[in-house]
Amino acid sequence: MNCPSCGAPMRLESDAESLTCDYCGSNVFPEKTDDGVRVLGAPTDEMCPKCSMGLVDAAFSGVRILYCTRCRGMLIGMEVFAALVQTLRNGQEGGIAPKAPDRSELDRRLNCPHCHQAMDTHFYAGPGNVILSDCERCSLDWLDHGKLLRIAHAPDALREEAEA
């Protein structure tokens, strides 16, 4: 992306939701998509495991992820996944009862965008009735469109017990 002020190339800040122009010093915070994702860059070398389009650098609630602009899936590092879910859950009252998952998703086979090996597809162990795919070797979780928010907005019996 080029700077809207001077036209020079912009640099993606590490651990930030912005791009910086080294020439004029401008910072650009891209608009959020209707999913709440800030798309920060052009496609990377890593391909979407679902639709084979190049994943882009993006940020969601301050956490850097890779995002597919076609199917809107998210590739999230396991080391930040739980903290991201907690951030999204904080401040929420109650929860939305999740719909039943599509069990046919358990039969799909996705390859990790990083190592290209088969990902493990399974039920998420927390709330939300979500099926996700992960790569233990690369410590990455793949969530289809809407599933992260489904996890965040689902009632959580363990959380409710802790608050009681």
Tell where the protein language model's regions lie, with residue ranges.
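Short Cys/His-rich "knuckle" micro-motifs
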Residues: 13-16, 31-34, 58-61, 78-80, ...
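Short amphipathic alpha-helical linker/capping segments at the junctions of internal repeats
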Residues: 38-42, 88-103, 151-164
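Intrinsic, low-complexity N-terminal interaction/targeting segments
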Residues: 43-57, 62, 102-133
